[in-house]
């Protein structure tokens, strides 16, 4: 009888130990998760509001070196041109419209006393002539920086099964094929310049990403997929070029006033290109809102906090986020179709 009682006590004790171990494991995991969250929030705030602006002398500014910028004639690309020139870089500007490039060339070279080369090509045409022209022009100059800004989205949100084939091909060609081909041409030139530099000059490759690539976006499926591809490609390239002293970063942005976004009015969540580019160049090398991602930066403060909230609260691949994104872009599509119908009646 006593032996049976003692056996039962031993069983209960063992079960109690197992329960205690389980509870302590859950508690430990909770503490680890909370600590990680707190550290990420702190790191984000330090990146955004505490650390001083990045010094671009390490990338060879004010030393005769060039920065190549694609999609440079309008919006964010145009602002990158102004602000990189202000930091002392000579420029090679690549875009589609020669008249815009020549106007920009004259304005920047006069204002900042830097050399500006321009090349007018349409990267939507995936031709060998385009890439040969880029290689021929850029091969003449010492290059330490490349900004892959050129990009294309849908004209309006559209279901994937209704997406025009030409629009789909154009998005993939501009956002992906052209970006990869141009980077493959320019990156060896950057490595060559940094190796030949008498100073410890680093190289820099920036690529424009998007919240559309961060979060799967119904009704912008092709664009969303093209930007998600850039995330994985850019982070992979960062690992490859690290040994060559080239910093590679993907820049994540939410909405910015531009011709592509079709938004003209700024707000707390929607900066203009000048403000967005200033926050980007101030924080290169820091993750800001992209704390969970390697070689990635979400530089504008409201975008950074928005990303941090989504990632830590529900996750970018959650059904809730996908549904909210769908409803949001469906409403944009409905308004766009109504506007198109009204415009058609006026004609």
Curated annotation (Swiss-Prot):
Functional note: Component of the microsomal membrane bound fatty acid elongation system, which produces the 26-carbon very long-chain fatty acids (VLCFA) from palmitate. Catalyzes the reduction of the 3-ketoacyl-CoA intermediate that is formed in each cycle of fatty acid elongation. VLCFAs serve as precursors for ceramide and sphingolipids.
Keywords: Endoplasmic reticulum, Fatty acid biosynthesis, Fatty acid metabolism, Lipid biosynthesis, Lipid metabolism, Membrane, NADP, Oxidoreductase, Transmembrane, Transmembrane helix
Entry keyword annotation includes Transmembrane: yes
Lineage of origin: Eukaryota, Fungi, Dikarya, Ascomycota, Saccharomycotina
Keyword Nucleus assigned: no
Active site: 223, 227
HAMAP family, per database record: 3_ketoreductase
Name listed for the protein in its UniProt record: Very-long-chain 3-oxoacyl-CoA reductase
EC number: 1.1.1.330
Residue ranges the record marks as coiled coil: none
Entry GO CC: endoplasmic reticulum membrane
One Pfam assignment: adh_short
GO molecular function: ketoreductase activity; very-long-chain 3-oxoacyl-CoA reductase activity
PANTHER family cross-referenced by the UniProt entry: HYDROXYSTEROID DEHYDROGENASE-LIKE PROTEIN 1 (PTHR43086:SF2), VERY-LONG-CHAIN 3-OXOOACYL-COA REDUCTASE (PTHR43086)
Pathway assignment: Lipid metabolism; fatty acid biosynthesis
Secretion signal, residue range per the UniProt entry: none
Principal location class: endoplasmic reticulum
Enzyme class, first EC level, given as a word: oxidoreductase
Subcellular location: Endoplasmic reticulum membrane
GO biological process, one term: very long-chain fatty acid biosynthetic process
Catalysed reaction equations from the record: a very-long-chain (3R)-3-hydroxyacyl-CoA + NADP(+) = a very-long-chain 3-oxoacyl-CoA + NADPH + H(+)
Gene3D superfamilies, A to Z: NAD(P)-binding Rossmann-like Domain (3.40.50.720)
Membrane topology, record value: Single-pass membrane protein
Residues the entry annotates as binding NADP(+): 68, 122, 149, 223, 227, 256, 258
Ranges annotated as spanning the membrane: 22-42
Family label: Belongs to the short-chain dehydrogenases/reductases (SDR) family.
